[in-house]
Amino acid sequence: MFAHVANAGVGDGIPFQFDRIATAPNTVRGHALVLYAQQSGGSPWALIEALFSAYFEQGEDIGDVDTLVRIATDVGLDGVEARAAVESGRFDVDVMQSQREAARLGIRGVPFVVLDGRYGISGAQPVEVFEQAIRRALAE
């Protein structure tokens, strides 16, 4: 499976380096950091891209607070506030609620896209799958 994903990434300019990944981190803190970025007016998408790059390209431990804070500051977030966001636990309830909702929807991994709250697309799918799902959602 990793070879398939790595090959797909090459075509899209994403150099997956699965051999660099030494740990499967707990991502609760990372999700909390994304919520902080959303609420602080930062770019959650830039943060998410940086987190994915750190993990899948560099093999960094994105469960480590210092790593998360460095990544946050790299994308322009305030380091002190980012650290407080992940260490304080103030976003934990929201993260857990999101995880419960994901479980309710049958989400077991990423990527997973939910359209219109009703249609789930699991895994790396071709564009045609998304087009078909969007057409279906619009038609109903």
What spans do the regions from the language model cover?
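Ordered, amphipathic secondary-structure segments that act as subunit-interaction surfaces
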Residues: 1-29
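C-terminal cap of thioredoxin/glutaredoxin-like
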Residues: 31, 35-140
